[in-house]
Every structure is written in C-alpha cells, then in structure tokens.
C-alpha cells in the first residue's frame, strides 16, 4: 500500500494557513513597500491634485459666479433659449463702454419684445460691482446659435424699435441716454452698487473734512487722460481737459454751494496734482490712478452729490448714476474732426447738464 504522505504534501487543517505563509507574506510586504511611494510623496501629490482641482473649478465658476451676482441663470444649451427670439451684445471696451452696452441691450430687447442675455465677459466686468440681473449666455451656447449681427450707432434711431431677426447680436459702442433714459429707474436699479462697494466709498467720504468740518456737498471730479493723451490730438483733432477748464468747473460749484468738497479721481493723478489748484483746501486727491481697478473710483464718484467730468464714458456713467448737477467739457474737437461723425454731444450729455467749452487753441496749432 502506498503511503500518500510520501508523495504529496499534507493539507493544512481548516482555518490555518499553508506552511511557509508567514515567510511569503513578509516577502510580499517587502516588495510592496519597495515600490510604493513614500508618505511624503503621497501627501505632495494630494496637495497638487487639490490645488489643481480648486484652480480649475475657480476658472469654471468665474464664468458662472455665485447667485448674488445676478438674479438670472446661465444658459448652457440652445434648447434652453426662450422662444420668440434673443438679443445679446458684444462686450467691448472697459467699464464705461460695457455699462453703455448693457443698458442699450436691456432697453432695446424690451422695446423689441426679445429676451436679453449678456456674454460671460460682460458679466465678469459688471457683476463684481453692480447687482445686474440679465442672465448669462454661456460661450458654448453662443457658438451654436446662428447670430445675425446688427450694428448700432452711438445714439438711438427710430429703426432700432423694429430690429429684424430671431437671434440678434448687437454690435458697436452704444452709450447714449437716448437708448435707455425712458427706463431710468430700471437702469439705476441694474447699476445698484453691491453693499460692500457702496459702504467702502461712503466710509471714505465720511472721513473727509473741509477746514476741519464735515462738508455738506461732495463734488466728484473725474479727469480722464490715459490713452486719450495720444489719441485725442492725433486721431480726433481734439483736446483734453486742461487747467483752465477744471478751474472754471470747480468755481462753478463754489459759486453755488457753501464749502463744497471736490473728490478728484483720475488715471493720471500726478497730472491732477500739478494742475488742479488746491489752495482753497477743498480738494482731495482720492483716486487710485489705476485703470485696471476702476470699482473704487467709480463708487466714490457715484456717492457724491454732483459731478465734474472731462471725456470718456466712465465719467458720463458716474454722473448719470450720481444725479445732481453735472459740468462737462464741451466742444473739445475741431469742426472737421471725424469724431463728430460718431459722437453727438446732444445724445451723450443730458440736456440739463452744463457744458464749459474747451480751449481748442492747441488743437488748431496742431491741425491748421
């Protein structure tokens, strides 16, 4: 009889590992730890993953900000677009231009019975400052819509009351009260400052004094220079506000208000300090001087009682929101300027605003 123990290994008893198992386990564990990353490496990779995830989520959310920024929704797919037609508009220029584009879209869409949607770029510019309500049209949706471009002049025309087409993208640089002034209350509501933006501006103004006393009248002054220093004399045959204009504008308010305080904002504060007479001790150079961060300067201007502006849509919008009296630079281009073909002063400045003519002597010398 064969002794089976001599030809085959004996099976282990139930519930016990095979013979030699501890040695195999030790060998496997050794190989695992030899190839497995260290704990510090694992932690480092986890941090990289987390940071990358947050970064990309932030970029994604930048186009779809938190609900407080607007009351509408983000349209992701064409089937979500409302029936009856849609208006949108290009997002060109900086803050003042895009405010004009937004207000024009708001008014013309309502006038034509269309739904209005803004591009993400416009939302990114306006929503951090204002409590705008128009919904955002996602880029992926916009690319799949058969848009019909419709160019607008800078002022309202009768034909804009009946704009043809189902999906219309308005183009141009519209910024005129003639588009939207009949909806002034609604436009002011759209451009209501967020509470924290308004409170920061008001806290700054409350801390200002004229000869030791808190002023009863604040006059915001916006001096636009920047690229206009080059563009205005060469391209448009015009001039910017000079020392004489600013002196006349400030004196206009001094003659009508007791101890007003002038709050100066500008993209060239050094020029303002050299050219604005502050000997009356009623001038505060308050602006940041930074074009890239306009919210603070804009908020300061809108919280003042009255406004002095020079050129540009930034100042025009600040004056429109502030209310009160506004003094503006008038007749700042020569009669033959191409600027007069695309800009109508009577459509840019409200009728009750006060114009002070620019000194065109330098422009005439440059363009005889």
UniProtKB/Swiss-Prot annotation:
Positions in the Lumenal compartment: 53-368
Coiled coil: none
Family annotation (Pfam families): Glyco_transf_11
Gene Ontology process terms (BP): carbohydrate metabolic process; fucosylation; protein glycosylation
Tissues in which the protein is found: Kidney.
Protein role: Catalyzes the transfer of alpha 1,2-linked fucose to ganglioside GM1 and galacto-N-biose.
Protein known as: Galactoside 2-alpha-L-fucosyltransferase SEC1
Gene coding for it: SEC1
């Amino acid at each position: 009889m064969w002794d089976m123990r001599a030809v085959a290994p004996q099976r282990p008893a139930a519930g016990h590992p095979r013979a030699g198992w501890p040695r195999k386990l030790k060998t496997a564990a050794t190989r695992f730890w030899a190839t497995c990353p260290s704990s510090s490496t694992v932690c480092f990779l986890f941090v990289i993953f987390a940071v990358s995830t947050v970064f990309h989520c932030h970029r994604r959310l930048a186009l779809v900000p938190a609900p407080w920024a607007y009351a509408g929704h983000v349209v992701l797919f064409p089937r979500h677009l409302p029936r009856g037609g849609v208006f949108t508009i290009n997002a060109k220029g900086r803050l003042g231009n895009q405010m004009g584009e937004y207000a024009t879209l708001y008014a013309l869409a309502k006038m034509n019975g269309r739904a209005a949607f803004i591009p993400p770029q416009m939302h990114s510019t306006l929503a951090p400052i204002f409590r705008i309500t128009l919904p955002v049209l996602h880029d992926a949706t916009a690319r799949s819509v058969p848009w019909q471009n419709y160019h607008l002049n800078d002022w309202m025309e009768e034909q804009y009351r009946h704009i043809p087409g189902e999906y219309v993208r308005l183009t141009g640089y519209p910024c005129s009260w003639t588009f939207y002034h009949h909806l002034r209350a609604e436009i002011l509501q759209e451009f209501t400052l967020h509470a924290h933006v308004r409170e920061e501006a008001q806290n700054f103004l409350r801390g200002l004094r004229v000869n030791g006393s808190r002023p009863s009248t604040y006059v915001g002054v916006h001096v636009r220079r920047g690229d206009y220093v080059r563009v205005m004399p060469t391209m448009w045959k015009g001039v910017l506000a000079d020392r004489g204009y600013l002196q006349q504008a400030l004196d206009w308010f001094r003659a009508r208000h007791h101890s007003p305080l002038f709050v100066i904002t500008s993209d060239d504060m050094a020029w303002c300090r050299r050219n604005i007479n502050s000997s009356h001790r009623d001038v505060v150079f308050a602006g940041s001087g930074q074009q890239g961060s306009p919210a603070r300067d804009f908020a300061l201007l809108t919280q003042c009682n009255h406004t002095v502006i020079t050129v540009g849509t930034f100042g025009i919008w600040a004056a429109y929101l502030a209310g009160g009296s506004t003094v503006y630079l008038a007749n700042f281009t020569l009669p033959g300027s191409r600027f007069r073909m695309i800009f109508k002063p009577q459509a840019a400045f409200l009728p009750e605003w006060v114009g002070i003519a620019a000194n065109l002597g330098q422009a005439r010398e440059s363009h005889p």
